[in-house]
Amino acid sequence: VTDGEFRRDWWHIDFLHGFDGVELSTGDIYGEAKFQGTHEQPPTMMVAGRIRRSKPSMLEHFKFLKSVVRKGLPKFTMPSPAMLHARADRASLKKVYPDVNELWADLTQCYREEIAELYHAGCRYLQIDDTTIAMWGDPKVQEQFRKLGDDPQKDAEMYTAAVNAAIRDVPDDMTVAIHTCRGNFKSAWVAEGGYEPVAEAMFSSGVDAFFMEFDSERAGGFAPLRYVPKGKKVVLGLVSSKTAQLESKDELKKRIEQAARHAPLENLCLSPQCGFSSTHHGNKLSHDEQWRKLERVVDVARQVWR
């Protein structure tokens, strides 16, 4: 059970802005790596100083969630540390951190401190949301980051290493999952392309489960699942949170069968491909349509894994 991120305007920016050294601007830094079909884009994160955690970023959010959950396990979501490197103004970042390794040292330390406090507050299920690694399957996005002087393959490895550093002190009784997609804003997305180019790097993450976007052809096929480490869970995001059309049970079962050719069925799960409202704007579907989709997920899961 999550809080739906109701206290956040933006699923990622609000959390990172809670750290010292991260400020916001209205400047346009996204170039071609923008959400398709909308002129509105997220605000720009600027790195104004060394990143520190002088106070909790969202500890109170979790405490509220835990106080109202009567049945089920409270799950807290936070953006991957990669989101700052990928989506912040690169000039401001390099000015403060000429050595990117120092950025990761400071940023992942903030994450470890936040996660430790969440754990002590009772959090036992953490989801890290990442819209960077999956985008490297899109040649246009790769080219955009090459213009910044990046090597997309090395970035994928670096971002996975950052996640591993952030969760390295997590106790054994805390489940950590990572959700990867290609952007979710007002039913729009940033990138297209499958997981194949980054599968090996992504699956080297030390998390317990991978939530993966597979709701449309732009997400590619299931073949990259052959790289999933033994015993790790894969949650197939087959139900779109971007459109109102309700997926048929037969089609969902068919796609689960296809995925099971590359990873054991007992290690697979089913979910929507992303959140229904990753920002305060929401997506282009009604509350009722949202609930029908969630019911469809539950019904199909019960039939497949009964």
Where are these regions (language model features)?
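Domain-level signal for soluble alpha/beta catalytic cores
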Residues: 1-306
